Amino acid sequence: VQLKYGFISVDDHVQEPPDLWTDRISRSRWGARLPHLERASDGAERWVVDGKVLLGGAVGKAGAFMPDRNCEPTRWHEVPTAAYLPAERLKVMDAAGVDYSALYPTVAGLAGEAFGRIEDSELELACVQAYNDWLIEYWAAASERFIPQCIVPLWPVEEAVKEIRRAVALGHRGVVFPSLPMHLRNVPHISGPEYDPLWAACEELDVPVCLHGGASPELQYPPTSGLNPRFAQALDAVTRPVSNVFVLSLYSFSRVLLRHARLRVVLAESALSWGMLYLEWADHQFEHDGLAREGYDLKPSEMFYRNCFFTSWFDQVAPFLSYVGAEHILWSSKLPLATSTWPRTRETLESCFRGVAPEAREKVLWRNAARLYRL
């Protein structure tokens, strides 16, 4: 892997353009059910798919590039070009000192959950495939510095596996998946064996499964509706990483991680601080509640160390190295979201890695990611 800056960001987002789905999917068949922009009575534009408004009525999520990072664009012409043009994003990456960038969606949801709510499986698959093709043709083709990651249909699992295989053959290097699909529509619980073919395919193809915090907003408490917008935004940002406690606990105790020894799981936007709590607490309850006598070969912490990665962008790293381990931490810039470290990414890195040995710093900032994505 060729590095100029020594930083691979594993959690950045692309802004999908207004014509992505309407140009790639039959409008004569699906009409207004396709993802598209609509103008509201107040003049603001909003994304709509299958009759549902997306992104809380915003046209995009690009707070880091806005004059006021707490105010998202409400019309397409307000969306900063670095959110949706690869050439402009590369300029920002150079200024931020980012060598490679692993890409997540925006309109499709943090993990594709916007399409997971579509009850019509044919429409869901069409939307998913259009996004996956576009990401390869538009972003990955623009520069090898972009790491494409596919989204998948939730059900049936056979279609999800077929799409993973198709997408990886196109060049996708990761699988972005809603951590709790049963929160989106009536599909089997994620802990059951129904999803084992999906995990097995990711093992076989050597691609990580990326579970993004916030893709299951039901886990975030308290709800932010009815609150002052700025208070709600701060509350959402604080509670989003901690929602991974439930996700990691479920994947451990339900034996998903136990059954799939070679599955690699990225907990995107997880942060680090709750990780120490989880690793101690989960092992304690594992023994205290008698799960250790239920035929588990590994404790929850051992499953984590074998399978998983935390992802942060702001934590002080040194306090967590002895417990979490440098081998299990990834770093991100979170472009172009309001929670991003931009435009102080370089300064933030130096502050966060104060007192960290060079070898550990390299693992967190790029070696782990280079190995994970086979760069």
Which residues make up each language-model segment?
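Mid-to-C-terminal alpha-helical segments outside catalytic/metal-binding sites
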Residues: 1-8, 16-72, 77-80, 85-100, ...
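Histidine-centered catalytic micro-motifs
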Residues: 8-15, 210-214
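Active-site mouth loops of central-metabolism enzymes
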Residues: 74-83, 118, 146-158
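Short glycine-enriched loops at secondary-structure junctions
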Residues: 104-109, 213-219, 335-337
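Glycine-rich, proline-tolerant flexible connector loops at the mouths of alpha/beta enzymes
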Residues: 105-119, 179-186
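Catalytic pocket-lining loop regions of alpha/beta-barrel enzymes
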Residues: 123-124, 139-146, 152, 158, ...
